[in-house]
Design a protein with these regions (language model features):
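Scaffold signal of the M16-like zinc-metallopeptidase fold and its non-catalytic homologs
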Residues: 53, 57-58, 98, 105, ...
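N- or domain-start disorder-to-order transition segments that initiate the globular core
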Residues: 1-24
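Short, glycine/charge-rich beta-strand/loop segments that flank catalytic centers
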Residues: 79-87, 114-125, 141
């Protein structure tokens, strides 16, 4: 059984961590307490768009994936109604690279017009593939408003 440790840093960041000495890999999950529920009903998709923009580079790291891959890591992210989760895995000896990448984009995301246009297209294509081009793919979008009527 793993001992789960919880801390709140001086900047308010909540840290939950546990150690597994049976592996040489480290997993980092950065979870933002924001998702589709925070969007205006007439302006949806921003949580997912920002998820993608987080991979567009930061002020000090123009390409997020290159240094991560050089450190032997991999990453992905997902968004739902309640949270946006970014995760990466790296070999234990390169955990500082993972923290460096996450902290740099947390503090200095490169929010350029070019990146916005590229990622907007990617998000729209994902929506088409997952929802519009699938039988009953739009059911969740149609039923969701009915599930939360007050």
């Amino acid at each position: 059984m793993f001992k789960v440790n919880r801390q709140i840093l001086d900047n308010g960041l909540r840290l939950v961590h546990c150690e597994d000495t049976s592996t040489q890999m480290v997993a980092l999950n950065i979870v933002y307490d924001v998702g589709a529920r925070d969007e205006h009903p007439q302006h949806t998709g921003f949580a997912h768009l920002f998820e993608h923009l987080m991979f567009g580079g930061s002020l000090h790291i123009p390409d997020y994936d290159t240094p991560l891959q050089l450190a032997g890591g991999e990453n992905n992210a997902w968004t739902n109604n309640d949270i946006t989760n970014y995760y990466l895995t790296v070999p234990r000896q390169n955990v500082e690279t993972g923290f460096w990448l996450e902290s740099d984009r947390m503090l200095g995301l490169d929010f350029s017009e070019r990146s916005l246009e590229v990622q907007r297209g990617v998000v729209m294509e994902e929506f088409k593939q997952r929802c519009l081009n699938q039988p009953y793919g739009d059911v969740g979008h149609l039923l969701r408003p009915l599930a939360y009527l007050l």
